[in-house]
Structures are given as C-alpha cells and as structure tokens.
A protein has these predicted regions:
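Conserved non-transmembrane functional hotspots
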Residues: 1-144
Length: 144
C-alpha cells in the first residue's frame, strides 16, 4: 500500500536535504583557505541555494512537523552565511556555531527521512484492508 501523504513528505524532505548538502559543499569550499579564488559562478550557486532554502524551509518544516524544532537553527545558518566570501570572513567562533547549527538541522532531517522510509517499507507489505483494520483497532474508543 502507498500513502500519498507519506510520499509527499519524503519528496519534500529529499529536496530539503539536497539543498542543505549543496549549501554545505559551498560553505566547505569557502572555509578552505587553500582555495584562494571564489568565482562568480560559486557565488551565484550559493545565492541560489540560499534563496531556495529561505523560500522553502518554513513550508517544508511546517509540513514535516519540524517548524518549532528546526526553524531557528536553519535561520541561524542562512543568516550567518550570506555569501561565499562572507563565510570566508567569519571568526572561528562563528564558524563553529554555523557548523553546529548546520549539523543539527541536517542530522534531524536525515533522521526523519530514515523514519519515513521505514514507515513506507512497512506500509508496502500491508494491504488496504489490513492497514485500515489496524487503524480501527488502535483507535481509542473514548477519543471521539
């Protein structure tokens, strides 16, 4: 059996994770002092990725039930990293906070993706009748 809402959440989560990975790649490049040149293309990619995250994060987190838990951390990352050059100029303390916030968001998204994939796998083995029967049997008769 397939759950349309579950599939929607997984697609949304996959897009978020991909954007956070792209942002991480660009931040990592910016922090590598051995790479002296920041190209206009890298700045464009950074700005585009950051803009996508700014536009989609609140909606995605709300749909996934993570808004209260992750929105502050996500905004901290997006506000600290305004450009590749800007990331390069952060102090060591700011870099540690940026990395910690990014890691917190990314870890939670990855954990949720694993949980949703596990739920999808368990649903794949159920028929429509057994799924609805299990829901009815789990329902609290006093909760109406």
């Amino acid at each position: 059996m397939r759950d349309k809402n579950l599939e929607k959440q997984l697609r949304l989560l996959t897009l978020q994770i991909d954007s956070w990975k792209k942002l991480h790649d660009l931040i990592t490049y910016a922090l590598d002092k051995a790479k002296p040149i920041v190209s206009a293309e890298q700045e464009r990619q950074f700005t585009e990725t950051r803009a996508n995250l700014l536009q989609e994060t609140e909606h995605a987190f709300r749909e996934l039930g993570l808004l209260g838990e992750l929105s502050g951390r996500a905004m901290n990352v997006l506000q600290r990293g305004v450009s590749v050059r800007g990331v390069r100029e952060l102090t060591n303390d700011e870099i540690r906070r940026l990395e910690a916030d990014w890691n917190g968001v990314f870890t939670k998204l990855g954990l949720m993706q694993g949980q949703l994939k596990s739920r999808r796998k368990s649903l794949a083995g159920q028929s429509m009748v057994s799924y609805h029967l299990a829901r009815v049997l789990r329902r609290d008769p006093l909760a109406a």
